[in-house]
């Protein structure tokens, strides 16, 4: 069964059948229904990939992301899929593990697969990797603040504002010495934003705050082992802030095993809030980063570019999403209500 046979059985032209599949709004309802009835009767499905090769579009986009197992990553994926699905596109997922070579190999593969566009999350590549050896001639959006990746469509979360709100809260509780436990596979973006937010909060509060930075695997096990090392060295900080919720959960377990009380002996907070943060004891003060909205924003930027090829690809388009601080119990908050949102 092919499109010509469908046209013959429906008593219409091949062009009409093509319009039913591609631009149904341009076909009279009774004609459209007649064609669709024939396709249903014969279980006919258009070969979208072959059609894409003919028209120069495959209705497929690629999402290159360092990891897919975290709550944050899953929300980005969900946001991208929501927008892509509404557009009738499928999404190819490529897990790069934060490895430049893996990411580059995936990009080469996506070029041969002729995807219509690419979303890269926290890319570790530089602009020369695209224009010289790869020459990717397709719309690309970057999620993250990497200024060297060559993307002119960028979406990212305002980590400086997130750090400012968190540190401001910590300073009101009397904390002055803050340690950041960072993902050992990421660049220094969060650490830089954390330091900038800390300094701004200190200036506003007219007090001096100090930041020290540690690295660990972005997992519960990574947080657990990192805190064990701190205990063994006798370097338990006043406040420990983690880059993600999983590290914080691991630290909470390590503190309990080591008979260290949170928040009495050490305050604990994290970026990238998840549902787990509100149900553990003590509930963890965290910064909610709207990852699903971030994925949706990136996908919308990408599809705007795919659908409007008259846009100047060299004009920077930037979308910045704002955080929300969720004040709970792990930093010493004594407010009687369950949660405060700032």
Placement of each model-derived feature along the sequence:
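Alpha-helical recognition/docking segments in bacterial nutrient-uptake
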Residues: 56-168, 172, 231-232
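A general structural signal for well-ordered alpha-helical segments in protein cores
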Residues: 3, 14, 32, 46, ...
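N-terminal helix-turn-helix DNA-binding module of bacterial transcription factors
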Residues: 1-59, 342
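Short beta-strand segments enriched in small/hydrophobic residues
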Residues: 14-19, 53-69, 169, 177-184
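Short gly/ser/thr-rich secondary-structure transition/capping motifs
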Residues: 41-47, 101, 121-123, 252
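ATP/adenylate-binding site constellation spanning eukaryotic-like Ser/Thr protein kinases
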Residues: 14, 32, 58, 77, ...
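Bacterial carbohydrate/catabolite-sensing allosteric modules
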Residues: 41, 82-87, 111, 135-142, ...
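Residues at secondary-structure transition points
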Residues: 1, 22, 26, 30, ...
